[in-house]
């Protein structure tokens, strides 16, 4: 997503009386909160057609913010902000990103101040996940894993490649694999997404005994936006994806023109290079 092409709709200083705070008195007596929201979307179609349905209705958004703020009680402004952002991003079609500022002008600090506030920015991210299985009912394990991911709050599956039967990689003395790739939108951070994938693997009774060994379900993050991450337990883009045909073939099916942020080549180019290398090796 090219954020430079996004337009903005702003809601400034919406006042809501609610009961958030650490102190019990705040939860009982309540106080004023002032909420501002910047909605990042595309207004081009609405501008051309003059149709409200082609845009985001800021009146409805103001009521949604007011309703959640009034009906729920949180100790922290941070919690209120996170829940508001998630609710709006998951509910509003066309909302790609949001900045929320929540002010608490009557905060019980005991000192003269104008206000205290928390400001966050959250957005949809695009991730590509490789999936595979070579034990038991392979398709069932994969289908259940994808379903679990689709049912995760803040996750949407956008495309799934064909399931491919492939030869085992690394340790070759094992059953054939069923492999593929999916494209998703998510509000989860890379670390949170990794944790969720591990939970789904564990739900399929995945055991990590032999490196590259048999597994009921394997879920790996290939790409997360155009981010480059190198941590002990997480490498994005996946460090070996350009050497694996069982990743590049399904990736080429759903995202041939996606560009690798490190190698600066498209998936289609990486696949062509790998196939040419394999042909030359075979000669």
Ranges and model annotations:
Residues 84, 88-89, 149-150, 197:
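Hydrophobic C-terminal alpha-helix "anchor/cap" residues
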Residues 124-155, 161-165:
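N-terminal beta1-alpha1 ligand-phosphate binding loop
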Residues 101-105, 163-165, 222-224:
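Short loop/turn motifs enriched for small/polar and acidic residues
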Residues 1-129, 133:
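N-terminal, polar/charged subdomain of small-to-medium soluble alpha/beta proteins
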